Amino acid sequence: MSKQKKSEIVNRFRKRFDTKMTELGFTYQNIDLYQQAFSHSSFINDFNMNRLDHNERLEFLGDAVLELTVSRYLFDKHPNLPEGNLTKMRATIVCEPSLVIFANKIGLNEMILLGKGEEKTGGRTRPSLISDAFEAFIGALYLDQGLDIVWKFAEKVIFPHVEQNELLGVVDFKTQFQEYVHQQNKGDVTYNLIKEEGPAHHRLFTSEVILQGEAIAEGKGKTKKESEQRAAESAYKQLKQIK
C-alpha cells in the first residue's frame, strides 16, 4: 500500500484516539506509543514497516502491568483471603475473555489497526487480537503516564466489572485445570509449544499439556496463550470424563 494511504489511516486513527481518550477522561503525551499499541502485525506487514513497530512488545509489558495492578486491587480489597483465592480471582480478571469485555465496553476494539487481509477475515472481532491490543494499550499507558494513571484507568474500566460480578461466567481453563489436578494429587502441569505455523500476520500456535511426564491434550489458537487455554480445556474435560 502507498505512503499516502498509510498516512490517511494513521491520521484517522490519531483523531479517533484523541476523541476516545477525551471521552474516557484521560490525557496523553506520546501518541506514537498508543499508535504502536494498536498496530497489529498485519498492518505493519502491509506497509513494510519495521517488524518491531507492531504491538507485541507493548503487549508483553502491559500483561505484567495489568497483573500488578489487579494484584494490588485484590490484595487491598480482600485482606482476609489466602493467596490461592487471590490467584484464582486474578486469573479470572486478566484472562482473555475478560480483557475482551473491558476493551469492547469502551470501544478500544474499533481502534485496532489491521492489515487488509486480517480485516477481511474478521480479525477485528477475534478475541485474542482484541485482548492483545488491550494489554498493549495498558503497556503504552504505563510508559506514557505511569502506574498511578493505569490505576485510575482500571478504576474506571476494569474494577467496576469485578465489583458488579460481571465476570462470573468467564472461564479460565488453565486455572481450573490446575486446581483440579492439585485436588486429585496428580502432580505438576506444564505446557509446551509444539508447533507454530502460518504467515506472520496470521499465525497458528499448537500447545500441549504435560501431566506426569505425558502429553495428554493439545490445543490450537491464534496466540500461544489461546492455544494453552484450549489445551487446558481439552485436558480438563478429558480428566473429568475419566473420573
Curated annotation (Swiss-Prot):
Its EC number is 3.1.26.3. Mg(2+) binds at E59, D132, E135. PROSITE patterns: DS_RBD, RNASE_3_1, RNASE_3_2. GO terms for cellular component: cytosol. It comes from the Bacteria. Keywords: Cytoplasm, Endonuclease, Hydrolase, Magnesium, Metal-binding, mRNA processing, Nuclease, RNA-binding, rRNA processing, rRNA-binding, tRNA processing. Residues 10-146 form the RNase III domain. Residues 219-243 are annotated as: Disordered. Digests double-stranded RNA. Involved in the processing of primary rRNA transcript to yield the immediate precursors to the large and small rRNAs (23S and 16S). Processes some mRNAs, and tRNAs when they are encoded in the rRNA operon. Processes pre-crRNA and tracrRNA of type II CRISPR loci if present in the organism. This is Ribonuclease 3.
